[in-house]
């Protein structure tokens, strides 16, 4: 097994700069494509997951993340699937936390559905995780079970409680879905803000084949914002978390509300991130199919220099923006791979 403490990293390099002058400082890593939910907008009910033998080992994920950190990544987010269902995931998180202690990494965080949070919240806090995103689209238990296909809302709420008690700041991510949760969004905002949690609303994205007509789910956030403005006083603020959300404050609740709008108002001009899958494929853009096989470079040499060069070559191909569209005529996704593989 590779000694992650003793293995030297590549020598310091210039920051990763893409062809459009944007520094890449944010890495999102999907540690597994598996999930204990089957959210209707994310994956098919009878999803075929990758064979476990195809996944990078935890040691390989650590090595890849460490090379990216050496090359200028300051924020690392673990995603899935559901990251906390990956076996021995806390071993990886514990090892990665050394980069927080050294000052090489500003933030180690994750996006989770919350189902396993009650179990892991204390350990996450001990590893230096200070912020997490919890995906939660409704506070109605029956609708929650419908959208997740078999999720238990009470477990998620218990997980949020545990995270907050452990001192972790929780942000709620909610996908806005037409005729499903649009009428509930004000209630969700009041509930979250009442507990000191920010909320980010997200437009559904055309990724992966699912059983539903995606055009029936799509709800533009411009419309949601207009509806909210009839109930709340919204004020734009320059607050940023390193991601694509644009934020407002709500006077009536005192909380922050973010909007992620890949369809109606893209966030490409300031994109600072790339995405690594659990099989070692690097996607330079969420909404493009171009990728780079870092697993090959990882396994070809014990030296990190070859891997560093493969990363540089990939970053040189980072596009200016994505190609997301809702194909209303053929109901085809813009990107064939599922979000659960790329990392949500």
Swiss-Prot record:
Organism: Brucella melitensis biotype 2 (strain ATCC 23457)
Binding site for [4Fe-4S] cluster 2: 268, 271, 285
Subunit structure: Monomer and homodimer.
Enzyme Commission numbers on file: 4.1.99.22
Function, in words: Catalyzes the cyclization of GTP to (8S)-3',8-cyclo-7,8-dihydroguanosine 5'-triphosphate.
PANTHER family: MOLYBDENUM COFACTOR BIOSYNTHESIS PROTEIN 1 (PTHR22960:SF0), MOLYBDOPTERIN COFACTOR SYNTHESIS PROTEIN A (PTHR22960)
Record-stated family: Belongs to the radical SAM superfamily. MoaA family.
Cofactor: [4Fe-4S] cluster
Catalytic activity: GTP + AH2 + S-adenosyl-L-methionine = (8S)-3',8-cyclo-7,8-dihydroguanosine 5'-triphosphate + 5'-deoxyadenosine + L-methionine + A + H(+)
Details of cofactor binding: Binds 2 [4Fe-4S] clusters. Binds 1 [4Fe-4S] cluster coordinated with 3 cysteines and an exchangeable S-adenosyl-L-methionine and 1 [4Fe-4S] cluster coordinated with 3 cysteines and the GTP-derived substrate.
One function term, GO molecular function aspect: 4 iron, 4 sulfur cluster binding
Domain Radical SAM core positions: 19-245
Binding site for [4Fe-4S] cluster 1: 35, 39, 42
UniProt keywords, alphabetically: 4Fe-4S, GTP-binding, Iron, Iron-sulfur, Lyase, Metal-binding, Molybdenum cofactor biosynthesis, Nucleotide-binding, S-adenosyl-L-methionine
Protein name per the record: GTP 3',8-cyclase
A biological process from GO: Mo-molybdopterin cofactor biosynthetic process
Pfam families: Fer4_12 (PF13353), Mob_synth_C (PF06463), Radical_SAM (PF04055)
